[in-house]
Amino acid sequence: RLMPSEKWNLSVFGKHYNSYSEGTVQLSDNNVGSDTRVSQSVSSFGYGAAGTYFLGKAIQLKLSYEKALRMPSTQELFGDGDLEAGKADLKPERSDNVNLSASYNKQLGKHGLYVEGGVIYRNTQDYIKRDLSTVGGTSYGSYTNHGRVETKGFNVSLRYSYSNWFNMGGTFNNLDTRDKEKKRAASSGQNALTYGQRIPNIPYQYANVDMNFYWHNLFAKGNTLTFGWDCFYQHDFPLYWENFGDPSTKIRVPQQISHNLSLGYSIRNGRYNISFECRNLTDEKLYDNFSLQKAGRAFYGKFRVYFGK
């Protein structure tokens, strides 16, 4: 790490990736069937650099580059024996990642303000793409290496605080991930019909907002009452390639908006804590993984005691 002055610094790093995976995968003519023991080992090297520059005390600029490797996960390699069919010969994703961001942090009396914005560029080879297939009336997820994929995006964050009793903030993310493989296969020479299309089955626009209140020394010194609200938004996105088929009959993962409320009370500087939470306040239909719907409106309570000094 190089730190020639308080205004800027530069870091250079290297990473060695070494992975060995062994497990059971389902293999048959349709990728669902008998269990077979398989294994795979991967060894590679990555590197990168990151720099920071301060414009005065309030503004910070950041720039980074990384030659990165993403190893296939256990589920991507071996499936889960139910809704996910593994692919034991998946290759790691190899990508060139560039990130540029700027932030502003200012405290004016009891008021605090933090703003950050950034842009992202990622050029990925052997992108691990998740597909959906149906065989004999049974649907399952599967994985393939897709060649070249390009991601461009941006994110914005904003947070405001007043003294020690109120804060609110939020983030907005937009990631445009597109197929950049021009040919269907290197040997065929045929143009790929999906070239330039958005990669399906991936959220590309989402945001969250939260608000929190704190009442210190309520009812007794060292006791604090907290109340919080947060909201998550996710834009709808296509389940399959969006330029294929009739637009009126295409399957899309619907837009999702969820609200959560929380109430907590800590006693004697946090030795005793009581909390209550309502998740998915408006009882919306929310989805996580393929074929897995999240719970509707739910209530939780928790009591915690800290036995340390």
Identify the residue ranges that each predicted region occupies.
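Outer-membrane beta-barrel translocator domains and adjoining extracellular loop/strand segments
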Residues: 22-31, 74-81, 127-135, 175, ...
